[in-house]
A protein has these predicted regions:
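Generic hydrophobic-segment detector
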Residues: 134-138, 142, 146, 187, ...
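N-terminal membrane-targeting/anchoring modules of bacterial envelope and secretion proteins
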Residues: 1-229, 234-238, 407-416
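Long, glycine/tryptophan/cysteine-rich extracytoplasmic
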Residues: 1-85, 128-129, 225-308, 365-508
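Alpha-helical transmembrane segments of multi-pass integral membrane proteins
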Residues: 105-168, 213, 217, 312-425
Length: 508
């Protein structure tokens, strides 16, 4: 099968399967008399509208006053992120299969052809499932669904191939090798800061999810009372629970925003945060029964420590990476450690906090939105507020994590080396018995050996094909199945040891 056609089949299947999963859920509720006046055709239309909303496509709402409701026009763009994960995960697996079927540098062929078909499917869905009350613009439906699918397919392909040169045919490592030593240190430092910020964001979302679970358990009686007051029966309760599960990731992001101090809104005039709550009428949904009361206890401000702890975890992770080349560079330029160490630690904390704040702001923008009706036009946190609050708290925690990180390690900084001063690992190869200095020396030696192997392949008779990061597959093997070189970390090159490796660990 041609690669472009395989991309069409794979991503076209993602569109069909994701729609069928939503349709199955709607039909189950319909068969249980959950939608009295919907009808079978209405079930297909409602499933298509939910499919578009799950793909980040805004829906235009225009209620007819003849249906017993006040005339209202608005935009529904409160995306159920739980349903957005469905096409993302399906595209992840499709990207893995496409990566295994491609030669080096050919992934863009099935990738672009599949995305073109997915864009056309979104435009067709907008035309088929639009009604007089709810509709989506064909142009928006052709663009927005590409976001979760393109991201999922690319991430899945990268996870399968573990090589950007194998996917796009551009060897960034070869370009980095031609730069100066300071440029290589800067690249390694920036890459480590980006990953540390991602660690802080993931830890923050996890803390928000734990806070949401604790709030639901604490207010479980109120949640059950709302179900009983609604009196929708088993079919209605099932549909309502499914709706809330679709918005569960949104609620976790709201809990994160609440823990940072930025807070969030549930309609115009209703804002809640640990520093104060402005009460107002809220929709009668069971999950909203876990909202904090108007009068908060004095200890509620203690939740502000959760983002700080996420920053401490990110700072500790950054320290364990051993890529603090900003501190190395400052130590070379200015020998006064009582100045360079606090300054580099503060700057690193600020950089990690900025990355984590930007990621949290993006999550807030995805989780917030409008239902287009009445007061429910503003739901969720404000992205800039989350950026400032979460970024500042993570920055403080990351600086603390970089300082206390050495005391969190199990082995002392100057543990005796059984393998001698060279840092060799004479044991089982795990390096668990080596001290920090020994592990750094062993890591430097492995990097040098990997660089030497790359140089030998570049000088071999195979020419340019032997110097690529992923060799051309033999006997029908794809990019993901080809034997890749030993991973040596981002921006690893044949370079002299960093100053931190020469000086050893600082004294406690």
């Amino acid at each position: 099968m041609p690669l472009w056609l395989q991309g069409v089949v794979e991503l076209g299947s993602v569109a069909v399967v994701s729609y069928l999963l939503i349709l199955l859920t709607v039909l189950m509720v319909w068969l249980a008399d959950g939608f009295d006046s919907l009808g079978l055709t209405g079930g297909f239309v409602l499933s298509g509208q939910v499919w578009l909303l799950a793909h980040l496509t805004p829906l235009q709402v225009a209620l007819d006053p003849g249906a017993g409701l006040p005339a209202t026009t608005g935009t529904v763009n409160l995306v159920p992120l739980g349903l957005t994960l469905v096409p993302f995960v399906l595209a992840w697996h499709a990207g893995r299969r496409l990566a295994r079927a491609c030669w080096e540098g050919q992934f863009w062929q099935p990738y672009l052809s599949g995305l073109a078909v997915y864009s056309a499917a979104g435009a067709v869905a907008a035309l088929l499932f639009g009604t007089g009350e709810i509709a989506a613009g064909p142009a928006a439906a052709a663009v927005f669904p590409l976001v979760p699918v393109a991201l999922g397919a690319f991430v899945g392909a990268y996870r399968a191939s573990r090589s950007l040169p194998g996917l796009i045919g551009v060897n960034a490592a070869a370009w980095v090798e031609r730069t100066s030593q300071y440029s290589r240190w800067a690249g390694s430092y920036v890459w480590a800061v980006l990953r540390a910020g991602f660690v802080a964001a993931v830890a923050g979302v996890g803390a928000g999810a734990a806070l949401l679970a604790a709030a639901l358990l604490w207010n479980w009686n109120d949640v059950v009372n709302v179900y009983q007051r609604l009196g929708t029966g088993v079919p209605g309760d099932t549909a309502l629970t499914g709706l809330q599960l679709g918005y569960l990731p949104n609620l976790a992001v709201y809990a994160l925003a609440w823990a940072t101090g930025a807070g969030f809104e549930v309609g115009e005039g209703t804002h809640t945060s640990p520093l104060g709550t402005q009460t107002g009428p809220v929709p009668l949904l069971p999950a909203l029964a876990a909202l904090p009361p108007g009068e908060l206890p004095s200890w509620s401000a203690a939740v502000l420590v959760l983002p700080v702890l996420a920053g401490v975890l990110a700072g500790w992770w950054f320290l364990r990476e051993g890529e603090n080349h900003l501190d190395d560079w400052m130590a070379i330029r200015l020998p006064a450690r009582w100045i360079t160490f606090p300054l580099s630690t503060l700057l690193t904390g600020l950089f990690i906090g900025a990355v984590a704040g930007v990621l949290a702001m993006l999550l807030s923008w995805l989780a917030q939105g409008s239902l287009g009706l009445g007061r429910l036009t503003v739901i969720g946190p404000e992205g800039p507020d989350v950026l400032l609050w979460f970024g500042a708290e993570v920055a403080v925690g990351a600086a603390v994590g970089c300082v206390v990180g050495p005391w969190l390690e199990r082995e002392p900084p100057f543990a005796p080396l059984r393998g001698g001063a060279s840092g060799e690992d004479p044991g089982d190869g795990s390096g668990a018995h080596l001290g920090r200095a020994g592990r750094r020396e062993a890591r430097r030696r492995r990097r040098a050996e990997a660089a030497a192997r790359r140089a030998m392949r570049s000088a071999g008779p195979a020419g340019g094909a032997g110097s690529s990061a992923v060799a051309r597959p033999a006997q029908g093997r794809g990019v993901a199945d080809a034997e890749a070189p030993e991973p040596v970390g981002a921006f690893d090159v044949d370079a002299p040891a960093a100053p931190s490796e020469v000086r050893g660990s600082p004294e406690r």
